Amino acid sequence: MEEGRLHRVMLSCGYSFTYARNLPEKAILYSQNCQQGYYTKEYTTVAGDVKIALIIRADPFIELPIAYILELPEQFKDRLMPHISLEGFLCYVEQMEADWDSNNLEDTYREVDAQIQRTLVNSVSAAMEGSNDKKELEGEFTAYWRPSESLFVLSNANRSTRLKTFISQSVRPNGSSQVEYITVEESSPENSGKVISAWLKLRYLPKNSLKEYHISTHYISVNPSRVAGMKWPPASFRDLLSWLGKADHNAKNKVVEYIKKEGKKRYVFLFDVLKQDTFGIYVEFDLKSIDLKRYKHSAKNSTAKLSTVLGGKSVCSMYQRLGVVRADIETLLSRNTRREGSAKLSEKRIALVGCGTIGGYLAELLLRNGAGCGKGHLHLYDDDLYKPSNFGRHTLSAHDFGRYKSLSLARKLKDSVHLPTQIIGFEKQFSIRADLMQKYDIIIDATGRPPVSKRMASIVRTIALEKRPKIIHAFNDGNGRASKVFIDDGRSCYGCMVSNPEKYRNGIDSRFCHIDISREKNKNCGSTYTPYDAAVSNITASLTQMAVLSTLDPELKWTYSEHMLEGGRSLKSQFLPRQPNCPICNEYE
């Protein structure tokens, strides 16, 4: 029934059903399978007709069809066209981001038909006239580059940085060759054996896979006059120089000048195309076929001559297109960037006190927001050992049984990233002293112990306000029934929170007063715990992450937040007022 409905819709849009055996034999959809077929249609453009085949997905209601180009005007063969891959697939919509009425098949496929027409018109216009070609290709230019290998940039590369590249070459278990290029800034912390070794380890590359030499690497900005409609991707170094000559002759001259000046055998060039992305190449020259020293001190007009010579088959012995992947610290943290005007977590001195369930989850969240990855540092405090009984509620593995949680967690964080970090674990309790506390910008109390929280709230008030760190108390309440986070920025304290007569009775949240909290705990000599799953601790860690990040904004929006899993409704985030009966605040008035 649905197939018949879809068939009628496609016919109404001007499509006809074509068996795969009747398609052009060069098309990747061609097949002798007598049962297989596709809906095809010719779309009109100023350059001629474009024939499209639609590949209908398993569920046409929630999956849009794939558009494949069967026939394209001859003038566009091997040319770069926006939204058309080299294999011939047309990207007419970003399906994962799109929204449509999945219950209205007719309107959905009519819109697909119209969108394909619009996309083809824009693509042809860009290829023929350069009309909005940079905009049409934005974000997808390098998708048509077709690299043979990957190059990972571990430093923040730009035109002003001096770069060098290492090559890792090894053999996969199936016998195929595995090559990876690794680029770093010469004067950066990433240019060290420790960082490179960490990268190889994380990438499961053998230590001995690294070649002994490094390659001269240059970062070149390209401001192309146009990008669409040109032959792409360049199949040789000669073709690349030809493309640069048409797109941006200054960039081409820089490439030749670097080779002329240095006279080396091997080069890596990274091309940063304006408003597009970065792609790279590796070239190797046969120095027996060309004496580069002859050109080093020659006249400026020799650049054009050298350009012609370098493109020769006997001179350029190797040419590889490289896919450039940025893996520097800014890229790693780019999706967690705060609003403009906010401080960076990587610059903050942070102490995480308590590396149990909450602290374990929180530490990983903090790292991914930059903690310990810049000028600041992340210190982890806990004197507790990690036991098998902790496994169900912790991020650590069986490898860490019998080891200090703080040390194991610090090692896990450092091993999860290839770049240098300032993360240190201390196998001891945090000493609640004013001189130690003021060495930090943010202190996170994840102990879940009221005596620790009250003592921190008291001692921090002996520090002058301008030198005082922000204290963030994170804890599960009601034996796992609630997640709570409180930011002590000086206006109220932990004591104020538990002294509020409207919400607390004898230090216990009034919503949990009817529960026999003590009875639910498992108590042994030297060990007390409450059995509940890790979900509440995950939530508390996430709330604490929000609290930490909110302290980076110019102004705090709240100091208290909670999430109730059972026992009542969650209160909205708010500023907790100072309580006149708070013993801590009253002591320091």
Curated annotation (Swiss-Prot):
Taxonomy, superkingdom: Bacteria
Pfam families for this protein: Prok-E2_B, ThiF
Record GO terms (molecular function): transferase activity; tRNA threonylcarbamoyladenosine dehydratase; ubiquitin-like modifier activating enzyme activity
Post-translational modification: Conjugated to DncV via 5 different Lys residues and 3 Cys residues.
Keyword Thylakoid in annotation: no
Covalent cross-link site, Glycyl lysine isopeptide (Lys-Gly) (interchain with G-Cter in DncV): 77, 305, 387, 484, 523
Keywords assigned by UniProt, alphabetized: Antiviral defense, Isopeptide bond, Thioester bond, Transferase
CDD domains associated with the record: E1_enzyme_family (cd01483)
Induction per the UniProt record: Part of a CBASS operon consisting of capV-dncV-cap2-cap3.
Impact upon substituting residue 91 to A: Loss of defense against phage lambda (partial), T4, T5 and T6 but not T2 or P1. No longer conjugates DncV to cellular proteins
EC number: 2.3.2.-
UniProt key word Transmembrane helix: no
Cited InterPro entries: Prok-E2_B_dom, ThiF/MoeB/HesA, ThiF_NAD_FAD-bd, Ubiquitin-activating_enz
Site of covalent link Glycyl cysteine dithioester (Cys-Gly) (interchain with G-Cter in DncV): 13, 493, 513
GO BP: any one term: defense response to virus
Quaternary data: A Cap2 dimer is bound on either side by a DncV monomer.
Domain notes from UniProt: Has an N-terminal E2-like domain, a linker and a C-terminal adenylation plus E1-like domain, dimerizes via the E1-like domain.
Functional note: CD-NTase priming component of a CBASS antiviral system. CBASS (cyclic oligonucleotide-based antiphage signaling system) provides immunity against bacteriophages. The CD-NTase protein (DncV) synthesizes cyclic nucleotides in response to infection; these serve as specific second messenger signals. The signals activate a diverse range of effectors, leading to bacterial cell death and thus abortive phage infection. A type II-A(GA) CBASS system.
Family: In the C-terminal section; belongs to the HesA/MoeB/ThiF family.
Protein name: ATP-dependent ubiquitin transferase-like protein Cap2
Species, as recorded: Escherichia coli (strain TW11681)
